[in-house]
Amino acid sequence: MKQPVGIGVVGAGAIGIRGALMHLSLPDVQDRVRLAAVCDPAPGRAEAAAQKYGVAAHYTTYEGLLADPGVDAVTICSPIGLHYAQGLAAIQAGKHIHFNKTMTITAAEADDLIRRAAEKGICMVASPGMMLHPHNRRIRKLVLEGTLGRLAWAVTGTAGVGDYHMEEEFRTGQDVLTDVNPSWYFQKPGGGPQYDVTVYCLHNLTGILGPARRVTALSGMVIPERDYHGQKIICDMDDTTLMLLDFGDSFFAYVYGAVAGRVTQGFQPNIYGTLGAVVGTRFGEQELKLPDDHQPHVTGPHAGMLESHVFEDMMQLADWIREGKPSVANAEHARHVIDIVEAGYRAAATGQTQTLRTSFEPLPIEAL
């Protein structure tokens, strides 16, 4: 397929607008992708988004979007708890898929999607493609070459994302595109920082180090309710989870997702070895994130825009469809991270360390 890929944007909330519509409506990508459709169940939202960003068609139902012959692929920008069912429907409709994180809530759901997609020849890219960042590849190369010595331990995590979502520009306005209710971030299924943002940390950590083997955890809720425009949000999903991962060979990593208290830099891990350490993106005095670094498609105006990593992952899917180039932002890596999150909650609930049942193939040194 060499013509532009018709993209259907599933959900016109914060990530649908900032990650998909703003990027895919720019002139520099029209030779490769086109905005074929957008859907959202909120009255008037899909229509408003289509008018603002020049989308060919708009729907209030996902089924309507999937039935549109102009849609070749979907980018799923809906709440995480809907991803599995929407992915399944896309596969059944013969549409290629980009999943915003996380692809599913359980590893079993991910298994099912991977199997069904393979059977039907469907391409699936699953965000976040953190190993598309050049600095992460440099860090992995240091690890594989033994520059850090024997690995001792690592730490990564994030904090405060709940407050961030309450204050996004898409929550503070009065119209249909800027008054998007954030309740799902704090509720089951799919809410909480683990599925929402710790996933970035875990993709970095496992992309650099390879798959983990076991996990144990403690988890709970610090903030039981929030207020959105005078409306009370009752939270029923844990907002603070602390995990300990076992990578084998006595190498462990501490991973946190909490309401407050960041001890690391961004989503980057600190990795400590017997001969040296990578702290964030620095190896000693050497900065591993260079000024001209960018993901393959994040150039021109995209480089200065928010959610450029989401745009990159969508373009990875377009390249796969058009040129037959599979992406490192693959479903198998996403499944392993989901396995870690799911097993972490299970470990916290049972008080028992959980053995992970999934794996993936990390980048070999010759690909770095």
Name every feature range the model reports, one short phrase each.
Residues 1-53:
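N-terminal Rossmann-like dinucleotide-binding module
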Residues 53-116:
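Beta-loop-alpha module in the N-terminal Rossmann-like domain of NAD(P)-dependent dehydrogenases
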Residues 99, 124-126, 155, 255, ...:
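Hydrophobic residues in well-ordered beta-strands that form the structural core
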Residues 112-130, 148-154:
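Rossmann-fold dehydrogenase core element
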